[in-house]
From Swiss-Prot:
Name of the protein in question: Cell division protein FtsQ
Function: Essential cell division protein.
Disulfide bond entries: none
Location of the protein in the cell: Cell inner membrane
GO annotation (BP), single: cell septum assembly
Periplasmic compartment segments: 53-284
Region (Disordered): 1-23
Organism of provenance: Myxococcus fulvus (strain ATCC BAA-855 / HW-1)
Domain POTRA: start-end pairs: 62-130
Membrane topology (Cytoplasmic): 1-34
Amino acid sequence: MAFGKSKNRRRQDAAQQKEAVRGAVRSQGPRALKVLGLTLGTGLLVWGGAALREWTLTSPRFELEAVSFSGLQRASRVELLRLAALTKGQNLWTLDVDALERAMDQHPWLRTVEVTRRFPNRVSVEVTEHTPVAMAVLGELYVLDEEGEPFKRVTPGDGLDLPLVTGLDREGYVADPAAARERLRSALAVASAYARLSPDQAEQLSEVRLEAQSLALVTASGQEVRLGEGDSEVKLQRLARVRRELGARGLAAEIIHLDNRARPGWVAVKISSPASERSGASMR
């Protein structure tokens, strides 16, 4: 009997172990399957991502076919493509847009540049160029934009016919660029007002001369107009009236003084003919 009891006990223990295993499977099985599924899913995503990356970097579909430019006037597409080392067949996904913009921005005529990838196989480049409005003597001859920025040296191929701003030197500009640009902007403002109020091509502006406390203009005919300081718009309107009066009398002026500080309304004129000179006339 003792042997029979021992055998029954072993059977009971085995049955209990099987039941325990079944219970563990019932309780832990779904969780284990979930973990396994997540592991497999993550693996598939990683593999799929790597495969997708490989495809995007090697597929002919994303090879550069065309580059379009807008805003070009002085700069050329050939120059910009060379600066950026941008060539047909490059993969669009590998292009560094910021690096392309920095490279193209080295061109002296460019004020701003924006590069955009147009998938699957194009790139567009939008540029804004400096607008040349004058030239300045700063040791060498530089081109000025409308902000008074000397953005490039004048080269023979520029083909510019612009007023010349003189009276500043390179040392002064380097020592205080902000103050120098402010003076250049004031000269450009006077040049712009002159062009608007004196459309006569015979008296086209040739030079704006910056002096210590004053400003003078020189025209293409060699006439000098001394504006002094301040009230440039009013003085230029007065200049137009003086020229009309001189023209009506058949006279031409060599120098016109509009810089009388004590009597701002007075105009002194040196007539071109040495035989006659008219000065001190009030032209209010």
